[in-house]
UniProtKB/Swiss-Prot annotation:
The organism's place on the tree of life at top rank: Bacteria
Chief place of localization: membrane
Family (UniProt): Belongs to the complex I subunit 1 family.
Designated name of the protein: NADH-quinone oxidoreductase subunit H
Family matches, as HAMAP family: NDH1_NuoH
Enzyme class: translocase
A Pfam family the protein falls into: NADHdh
Signal peptide, first to last residue: none
Amino acid sequence: MADFWATSLGQTLILLAQGLGIIAFVMIGLLLLVWGDRKIWAAVQMRKGPNVVGAFGLLQSVADAAKYVFKEIVVPAGVDKPVYFLAPMLSLVLALLAWVVVPFNEGWVMADINVAVLFVFAVSSLEVYGVIMGGWASNSKYPFLGSLRSAAQMISYEVSMGLIIVGVIISTGSMNLSAIVEAQRGDFGLLNWYWLPHLPMVALFFISALAETNRPPFDLPEAESELVAGFMVEYSSTPYLLFMAGEYIAVWLMCALTSVLFFGGWLSPIPGVPDGVLWMVAKMAAVFFVFAMVKAIVPRYRYDQLMRIGWKVFLPLSLAWVVVVAFLAKFEVLGGFWARWSIGA
């Protein structure tokens, strides 16, 4: 039997099982994210939120998904049908694809590649094409304006996110996400994690993640008061559901990246307590809680404010931080965190 799993067919079946496992985890997380988002928002507004379908309203997301699937797909006149239907599918597939390099535990990763960080950013950069295609193919000015906003917004904040992660890569000496987690292992638990040496950049990374995923207060591409639903105005039923699923999966991915890069991934925060996948999921849930709270309490920015913050504040700060981290690593000024990799050695 062991010989069978070593064959090409056996390896293919293993990869298929891993892929299905990742999809199941992400989809279950998607349903819980939507439920949690609505519950947290309701609590802030002193409402109950979903509380009828299932215990504590847990099945409300399933009921809503079923409602969208069984609704009629209304296709407006004048749309480019192939591109119109391809756009939401592309958004969902790309959002799922980035998960193949995310480690959930030691050895629990589908593709443990040495350029995992680059892979995630490459796939995330492609997600904007689904939005642009949907806005352009809808043959309407509101979706098109929303898609243009999204393209400019995502490109602007990807630059800052990339520079912030360069600082983490310098500290670790690797672009492998599993190696980044292991580099944060130490005798002092959470004090060994990168949130401490990179503290100024954790907040910038989180805010950039909000803008990258079009979450409030940076949800300008789908601003209800201005563009109704932005690039999704002309979508209904299953295509609309695919767009929304892609957005929440991208948010879930950013929660995972934040946990891996700055909060030790699957590592236990308490010395002596075993590491494991539960710690990873708990950290992702904690990051999403902050996402949801920001959505509930922070008002939306104007578009000019959004772009000004990205280019005039975040970009210079993140670039300066890369220089600082490179200097500390090169000359081993502080040792410890910064002596992991000697640049040019």
